[in-house]
Amino acid sequence: MSPDLGAGRIGRFWKRRTAAAVIAAALLAASIGGTVEARRGAADPSVITDWNATMVATIVVDAGKANAEGIFWYSFVQSAVYNAVVGITHRYELYKWDVRGPRSASPEAAAATAAYRVLLYYFPASQVRLDAAYAASLAKIPDGRSKRQGIRYGKRAAAHIIRLRAGDGRNAPITLDVPLAAGVWRPTPPAMAPMLIPWLSQVRPFTLRSPSQFRPGPPPALTSPTYTTEFNEVKDFGSKTGSSRSDAQTQTALFFSDIAIGALQGSLRDLATRRGLNISDSARLFAAADLAGSDSGIAAWDAKFHYHWWRPITAITLAADDGNPDTAADGLWAPLITTPPYPDYPSGLCNLMAAVSRSVTRVMSTIPGTVPGSLDLNITSVAAGLPGAPLTRHYATAADLLTDAINARVWSGIHFRTADVVAAQMGTQVSNWALDHYFKRIRNGD
């Protein structure tokens, strides 16, 4: 079997950081009892999941924003929706805003309006889709003063996020210019494309102080024992042909080869619906997961841009130049899946999975009835070549998810193991920072 370097470390790292926070949160949740929001039972939480689905269709399907760029845009929408809801329900602290709406306002109208206005501002080409979704949302809400107040407040919530993100550095003309040298990233086959969305490495984060706040130390040196071990592991277990992978390992590798960011949003919608989250908790779940996920991508791109470490396919092809007598070159080697067009270290997927799973675990720990440390996430993959696709896997804990994600990127042949292990630690740090500073419960709030 493949050596599972790092999975145990991730589990221990997760458990240490989780135990105290989860126990405290569970005790707080149990002590709160029924809230004003729960007692009045008026707000329909489906507006949150409905607009999350519309957001994905707009950003991914219509605009073609994928990978880390897609979840970056999600954060614009989910932060506005979150503010629009909790500014009325008074359940959680506002995100970088201090304007609350009237308690009599409709949070459904506010949420729908905030999502609609943000999406229409940035993606006007989707107006037909957005107009139809907005009309459908408003049709479910009785006409009257509450609805009008909600619409007005939702407009203010959207305008605030648009102002807040002005001049954040997105789409800046940044390129990665590095020398051709051992250990240095270069475009990979078959596309030989330049680094994708390099501006993400320097864009203003949503919750972090800077993109480099959690920048890790450098990857293992080319002549180190760790590099040698990981080189030979990915060369053996990540090869497209003649590998030592088992069928189960290949299936895991393929499963994570196409965990689209849109599919992950579907996992969150499923969780919110299954657990019957109210409108405030649902808005908080999406905001915490997406803003932490977005910042994990920014942090990953910062480190990728800073270290510009080569991918396994380059390392294996050019091993004769790495100065390591224990690595052997193979000019015909190819990975199981196509290598993405950006540097190896750290892994973007593992960073994202860690940030989202940590956020979900912490948010759900405040919901009565949640098993401490539980993730309870259903994730569906539509990857080409995956037997039985679309295929859904259930992950009971974040540690289980991260173990699979880390191994998958090695078995896919696109990452050295350290890139995945370090990324998982980074994503957890990003999420902890986000939830330690934002989305906090208002004591004695509704």
Name the predicted role of every residue range:
Residues 30-40:
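C-terminal region of N-terminal signal peptides and the immediate post-cleavage residues
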Residues 1-15:
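N-terminal secretory signal peptides that target proteins for export/translocation
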Residues 15-21:
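Internal signal-anchor transmembrane helix that establishes type II topology
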Residues 39-446:
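Acidic/polar surface patches and capping/hinge elements
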Residues 21-31:
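Bacterial N-terminal signal peptides
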